[in-house]
Amino acid sequence: MAKAKFERTKPHVNIGTIGHVDHGKTTTTAAITKVLADAYPELNEAFAFDSIDKAPEEKERGITINISHVEYQTEKRHYAHVDAPGHADYIKNMITGAAQMDGAILVVAATDGPMPQTREHVLLARQVGVPYILVALNKCDMVEDEEIIELVEMEVRELLAEQDYDEEAPIVHISALKALEGDEKWGKQILELMQACDDNIPDPVRETDKPFLMPIEDIFTITGRGTVVTGRVERGTLNVNDDVDIIGIKEKSTSTTVTGIEMFRKLLDSAEAGDNCGLLLRGIKREDVERGQVIVKPGAYTPHTEFEGSVYVLSKDEGGRHTPFFDNYRPQFYFRTTDVTGVVKLPEGTEMVMPGDNVDMSVTLIQPVAMDEGLRFAIREGSRTVGAGRVTKIIK
């Protein structure tokens, strides 16, 4: 079957279901696809519960994650939806960024109210920077008493407020199972949930709208022309004759001008996020730049050496360490295109970290790296990946 061409006519938003085990995340996902397929058959196809629940294994930086991707459209938007069935899968996905979310649907069973994993998922969503959460209060067909539902709503709002999410976020009453079975009343509630997503999850900021940033992967000298650096543009756009800074790894940053942009052996006037290209740099010698530095719009980014990060440590089965590590552990931190050694400080009260754990740690790097909150990294020992994480706070 040929891959369908991705039509870029509507805004594209990445979304996901989060919440406690057995509260109905996967059933909610299946119900959304069914109800939208019934409402807009030309735009959507229904995905059965089983096809979502048997999530295929994905490898992201050597970590195995079971995760399902479905897509659907409302009149306003195109959504890519991720559902991580297992609790461990959810944590791994959030930290490694196998699927990034622009917004999340927190599924809470009205029969139970918020449970420990509900709280943990919301905390993790905040840590990894999911911008918006709204709520699907599921299994409402099983609760007769309005007062119970009101109490659950209050608890959910408190939980959102604790993590600085919108306390006034929509809480839509649903019965995912009834909607899946074709019940008209509950089908309407799923449409209301999608309307709430359309109206409340903000449009994501596209990478092209951010200031220019390209990590250097390779460096060449072209006789008579100068030094060319190659890499994939991560953010923003760049035009020929723009000034740029080369930052990170070395103590001092360097300023230069881009005199040529090349892609697939063709000369271009500009490059934008997603492009693999070569940049010809004025007056720069080959030894002035190295892999792992980044080319940026002047003043837009700064290199740092100290940060806090949220980390998932690979289990032995995933090819990680066989033994725990302790305070002052010194692995390499792989940012974008290069490894930098760092010293780990564990949080107060944490003696050691076991393979398979997730942990918040402070890191001091021996060389500066251009970073901001949300930047992902791998932790390596030699060529072996032993962990994955993301920057949650910059210290220095």
Swiss-Prot record:
Its EC number is 3.6.5.3. Residues 19-26 are annotated as: G1. It is found in: Cytoplasm. The keyword Metal-binding applies. GTP binds at residues 19-26, 83-87, 138-141. The keyword Cytoplasm applies. Residues 83-86 are annotated as: G3. Mg(2+) binds at T26. GTP hydrolase that promotes the GTP-dependent binding of aminoacyl-tRNA to the A-site of ribosomes during protein biosynthesis. Belongs to the TRAFAC class translation factor GTPase superfamily. Classic translation factor GTPase family. EF-Tu/EF-1A subfamily. This is Elongation factor Tu. It comes from Corynebacterium glutamicum (strain R). The gene is tuf.
